[in-house]
Swiss-Prot record:
In the N-terminal section; belongs to the carbohydrate kinase PfkB family. Homodimer. This is Bifunctional protein HldE. One of its GO terms (molecular function) is heptose-1-phosphate adenylyltransferase activity. It catalyses: D-glycero-beta-D-manno-heptose 7-phosphate + ATP = D-glycero-beta-D-manno-heptose 1,7-bisphosphate + ADP + H(+); D-glycero-beta-D-manno-heptose 1-phosphate + ATP + H(+) = ADP-D-glycero-beta-D-manno-heptose + diphosphate. GO terms for biological process: ADP-L-glycero-beta-D-manno-heptose biosynthetic process. Residues 343-474 are annotated as: Cytidylyltransferase.
Length: 474
């Protein structure tokens, strides 16, 4: 399955559910308490992050999709912290505030990136389901997907009314279920239980075949459009009526913290479906996103640039021949890893030893080397009739096979100035015996603080000489 980045900016999503605040106390620990055999943590940083349904909305907004949120909080400092964080992220949050109940807070005590203790401040909310539903109904006409983020804390008490209201409007409903009564999600377009939640409903599954069988039965019983079971290190399994099961392996390179991974899955799914993606593609994107977020500490969101870079890696475009959009993503990724970008350009009509030596020297000036190649029409204008000898596709394919070259791109103009304006390399390199001020594009690179280098040519190595020799022998 070929992955691509959806147009999230045209994908409004509404999240309804249990809102909470994830609070982190960070500090160092170097001794054991004399009062009890527990570590003493000297807190030096306090951090608040939206959690639960608020984290789902935050993830959707981080992908670039318009996100709205309806939930329940107390009327307290934690609710203010949530409101401010969500507003800063561009989330439209509408909270039903309960004056005599606290906002749900999950407090984690952290030291050296390890969680030492979690303290929960919560009690089930006594909410007015009709008031909450009215808030949801007022927002339904402006959205493309409805998400029910259910943590069983009391915000969601009228699942069926919300599902039916959305279905009447043709709006898909995605639910992240909790509890032992999945009947409340009847008629949903997709539910996303993890394996333990799924098995709590259908019983233990001895293998994938049994998981598929029991999942199909559950979909039929609950009139579900689809079922996605998230299975940790075993990936995900997507089930749809009358279609073959789709198993996706886990994508995490390193698992650092699984907090909020389920939120990332349903938020990416919702945004992708709202953007018009087919369900298998949306699930593949969600699987990719989950693999990224578990590599972060604590409740975290995945950004659009992070997902784009992951798609690029998945599609094998970390190296090779790229278009401009792909190249800019690759450059952004390299810069995120503090890599130095080197740029050179030329016709490279017949690749010879001089070219190889020159490109190796250019690559040694940084971490990544971009080679921009004149297209065929451009070469013909520069070199005259009969050139190029090799088409631009062949020239780029040969260059991409060199160990010194990371990315190859073609350009139609006589000079690479347009590319330089977009890419902004750290180093612009040319081969020749002229001064830096004579290098085309030097002024562009130097204007933003980049470096321009001129490398000497290898003697007795010339494409023109090779072409003339071949023609003379012909």
């Amino acid at each position: 399955m070929k992955l691509s980045m959806p147009r999230f900016d045209q994908a409004p999503v509404l999240v309804v559910g249990d809102v909470m605040l994830d609070r982190y106390w960070h500090g160092g620990t170097s001794r054991i308490s004399p009062e009890a055999p527990v570590p003493v943590v000297k807190v030096d940083q306090i951090e608040d992050r939206p959690g639960g349904a608020a984290n789902v909305a935050l993830n959707i907004a981080a992908l670039g999709a318009p996100a709205s949120l309806v939930g329940v909080t107390g009327d307290d400092e934690a609710a203010e912290s949530l409101t401010n964080s969500l507003k800063a992220a561009g989330v439209l949050a509408r909270f039903q505030r309960i004056a005599d109940q606290p906002t749900i807070v999950k407090l984690r005590v952290m030291s050296r990136h390890q969680q030492l203790l979690r303290i929960d401040f919560e009690e089930p909310f006594r909410t007015d389901p009709l008031a909450l539903s009215a808030e949801v109904y007022s927002l339904l006409d402006g959205i493309k997907v409805l998400v029910l983020s259910d943590y069983g804390k009391g915000a969601l008490k009228n699942h069926q009314a919300l599902i039916q209201a959305a279905r009447k409007r043709g709006i898909p409903v995605l639910a992240d279920p909790k509890g032992k009564d999945f009947a409340i999600y009847r008629g949903a377009s997709l539910i996303t239980p993890n394996l333990s939640e799924f098995e709590a409903i259908v019983g233990h599954c001895v293998d994938e075949a049994q998981l598929v069988t029991k999942g199909a039965q559950l979909m039929q019983e609950l009139d579900l459009g689809a079922l996605l079971v998230t299975r940790g290190e075993h990936g995900m399994t997507l089930l749809r009526p009358d279609q073959q099961a789709l198993h996706l392996p886990a994508r995490a390179r390193e698992v650092f913290d699984v907090t909020g991974a389920g939120d990332t899955v349903i938020s990416t799914l919702a945004a992708a479906i709202a953007a018009g993606e087919e369900l298998p593609h949306a699930v593949a994107l969600a699987n990719l996103a989950a693999g990224i977020v578990v590599g972060k500490l604590g409740t975290a969101a995945i950004s659009a640039p992070e997902l784009r870079r992951a798609i690029q890696r998945e599609e094998g475009s970390e190296r090779g021949v790229l278009g401009l959009e792909q190249l800019l993503l690759a450059v952004d990724d390299a810069r995120a890893h503090k890599e130095r970008i080197v740029f050179t350009n030329g016709c490279f009509d017949i690749l010879h030893a001089g070219h190889v030596t020159y490109l190796e020297q250019a690559r040694a000036l940084g971490d990544r080397l971009i080679v921009a190649v004149n297209d065929d029409a451009s070469v013909s204008r520069l070199k005259g009739p009969g050139r190029p000898i090799n088409s631009v596709e062949r020239r780029m394919a040969v260059l991409a096979g060199l160990g010194a070259v990371d990315w190859v791109i073609s350009f139609p103009e006589g000079t690479p100035e347009n590319l330089l304006t977009h890419v902004k390399p750290d180093v612009l390199v040319k081969g020749g015996d002229y001064g830096v001020d004579q290098v085309v594009g030097a002024d562009i690179v130097q204007a933003y603080g980049g470096e321009v280098r001129v490398l000497g040519l290898v003697e007795n190595s010339s494409t023109t000489a090779i072409v003339e020799k071949i023609r003379g022998q012909g």
